[in-house]
Swiss-Prot record:
Residue numbers bearing the N6-acetyllysine modification: K249
Protein name according to UniProt: Probable E3 ubiquitin-protein ligase DTX2
EC number: 2.3.2.27
Residues modified as Phosphoserine: S360
Polar residues biased stretches: 274-285
RING-type zinc finger locations on the chain: 412-473
GO molecular function: ubiquitin protein ligase activity; zinc ion binding
PROSITE patterns found in the cross-reference section: WWE, ZF_RING_2
Length: 622
């Protein structure tokens, strides 16, 4: 059994060079290293931007991971907030940077992995890999991970990991690959300590960090000390290497939802003069007939503020953009993270903050008070307070058809029987007003069917008073869908999309929680999942983009944007999926077809909306 290393084993840096490992934190608080290739790219960008902090140019503040690995195209690392942001779902993950000696496991490209339940191999966090490598090098065949805070032992002989409480075993393996990147520990002249790369220290002065300022964010301890936490925890423990994080180690929930407010520029460089950058926001809630499990709710709103007026003077500290987050929620994370990515891309420092719940001013004050830097659109909601009475199915059929005395010599495409014979649904559909031999054609398109077949088709749908021709898809009445309850929010930014450089950007955020299927869904009474929410979508803020936005609002009210069905990507059943109205979920890199530039997108989505019965005529009726 391996014992905790003694103080004599503490390693000391004798070189300004070290190996950098970047890791991200999952929802359970476990850290996962990026691959050596991705880490090399991140470190290169980080060092470059860190060098620019000393006056070598403007900063992007964000690192697009897709440039290093195409499979990571949706992900961006936002350096000021030390956050990995997924553009298509809005998911935010904490990231950190570790420095190891060059002779460590990461420096030699050694990675230890364990076999997960789905049959894939998952890498241990870098400090665990290094510890395992050290113990095996000393001849310890059975390594106890308790010094790192884990309730496991790893048997090098059998290549297994054993839970000391449940005795459950997993396979482990040792992989050798490319070494992680070697970096230089940057410190300005006169600085004797290891430079802290946290954004608070980097912004503290224009001459670099000072030795006494690293203690709040950098751990430099004897190798892998016995933790003071319970042995079952999943938080990380650091060794002789330095663990860089933006703040003191927060709680598990706080690390993801409540970053502290930083009041200075993350990199110490003054942003360009933006004048008054307006940020517009509106929200549209859909509260249709939806059954939610106890305790479920939709997310609240997020407010943002932008500084106005001239930029800061060279000797002053520029103001930041605080993102107000009254309650930690996924939509708020998405909005705050998206704002951080957008604003940092133009050089404006953005920091997430946890704000107290604001008190609502009187309505008269809300109506009269306005700000030059923030403009809010009227908040709209749809609350089905008084549902319309359900029309009689037979009457709906009669409203859109004309009965034919002599049926044409053709088949009914619904039941595949001759129109001159009885309806194939006569044995399962009972109606006193429509006979089994009755035939009619739809008034607009003139396609003919058994009227009883049309009745069966209508009763099998939403029964919302509308019909859609099964032959040509012509819509009669106002078509509605089966979209679950959720929320639609809209923001506007003064940044352009590729191919639309002459205008700003419209950001749409859809939020739908998990729930219970209603009578209009495939399996009424059973739960449904809502993966990847909130989802972010982008439109150019020009005349055509604004028209598409207004039509999407109509489609949202009619419950046409999403539905409950089977995912075409994962095969999961009873889950929320898109409903034939395509959205752009990425701002750029149109490799997958979900981003920009795409010169035909707006015309295509207008055609898809029209196929659902949502046209400009709907806007005139509002």
């Amino acid at each position: 059994m391996a014992m905790a290393p003694s103080p004599s084993l503490v390693q000391v840096y004798t070189s300004p060079a070290a190996v950098a490992v970047w890791e991200w934190q999952d929802g359970l608080g476990t850290w996962h290293p990026y691959s050596a290739t991705v880490c090399s790219f991140i470190e290169q960008q980080f060092v470059q931007q860190k060098g620019q902090r000393f006056g070598l140019g403007s900063l992007a503040h964000s690192i697009p991971l897709g440039q290093a690995d195409p499979s990571l195209a949706p992900y961006i690392i936002d350096l000021p907030s030390w956050t990995q942001f997924r553009q298509d779902t809005g998911t935010m993950r904490a990231v950190r940077r570790h420095l190891f000696p060059q002779h460590s496991a990461p420096g030699r490209g050694v990675v230890w992995e364990w076999l997960s339940d789905d049959g894939s191999w998952t890498a241990y966090e870098a400090s665990v890999c290094d510890y395992l490598e050290q113990q095996v090098a000393r001849g310890n065949q059975l390594v106890d991970l308790a010094p790192l805070g884990y309730n496991y032992t790893v048997n090098y002989t059998t290549h297994t990991q054993t839970n000391k409480t449940s005795s459950f075993c997993r396979s482990v393996r040792r992989q050798a690959g490319p070494p992680y990147p070697v970096t230089t520990i940057i410190a300005p002249p006169g600085h004797t300590g290891v430079a802290c790369s946290c954004h608070q220290c980097l912004s503290g002065s224009r001459t670099g960090p000072v030795s006494g300022r690293y203690r709040h964010s950098m751990t430099n301890l004897p190798a892998y000390p016995v933790p003071q936490h319970p042995p079952h925890r999943t938080a990380s423990v650091f060794g002789t290497h330095q663990a860089f994080a933006p703040y003191n180690k927060p709680s598990l929930s706080g690390a993801r939802s409540a970053p502290r407010l930083n009041t200075t520029n993350a990199w110490g460089a003054a942003p360009p003069s933006l004048g008054s950058q307006p940020l517009y926001r509106s929200s549209l809630s859909h509260l249709g007939p939806q059954h939610l499990p106890p305790g479920s709710s939709t997310s609240g709103a997020v407010s943002a503020s932008l500084p106005s007026g001239p930029s800061s003077s060279p000797g002053s500290v520029p103001a930041t953009v605080p993102m107000q987050m009254p309650k930690p929620s996924r939509v708020q994370q998405a909005l705050a993270g998206m704002t951080s990515v957008l604003m940092s891309a133009i050089g404006l420092p953005v920091c997430l903050s946890r704000a107290p719940q604001p008190t609502s001013p009187p309505a008269s004050r809300l109506a009269s008070k306005s700000h030059g830097s923030v403009k809010r659109l009227r908040k709209m909601s749809v609350k089905g307070a008084t549902p319309k009475p359900e029309p009689e199915p037979e009457q709906v059929i009669k409203n859109y058809t004309e009965e034919l005395k002599v049926p044409p010599d053709e088949d009914c495409i619904i039941c595949m029987e001759k129109l001159s014979t009885a309806s194939g649904y006569s044995d399962v559909t009972d109606s006193k007003a429509i006979g089994s031999l009755a035939v009619g054609h739809l008034t607009k398109c003139s396609h003919a069917f058994h009227l009883l077949c049309l009745l069966a088709m209508y009763c099998n749908g939403n029964k919302d008073g509308s019909l859609q021709c099964p032959s040509c898809k012509t819509i009669y009445g106002e078509k509605t869908g089966t979209q679950p309850q959720g929320k639609m929010e809209v923001l506007r930014f003064q940044m352009s999309l590729p191919g639309h450089e002459d205008c700003g950007t419209i950001l749409i955020v859809y939020s739908i929680p998990h729930g219970i299927q209603g009578p209009e869904h495939p399996n009424p009474g059973k739960p449904f999942t809502a993966r990847g929410f909130p989802r972010q979508c982008y439109l150019p803020d020009n005349a055509q983009g604004r028209k598409v936005l207004e039509l999407l609002k109509v489609a949202w009210k009619r419950r046409l944007i999403f539905t409950v069905g089977t995912s075409s990507t994962t095969g999961e059943t009873d889950t929320v999926v898109w409903n034939e109205i395509h959205h752009k979920t990425e701002m750029d890199r149109n490799i997958t077809g979900h981003g920009y530039p795409d010169p035909n997108y707006l015309q295509n989505v207008l055609a898809e909306l029209a196929a659902q019965g949502v046209t400009e005529d709907c806007l005139e009726q509002q």
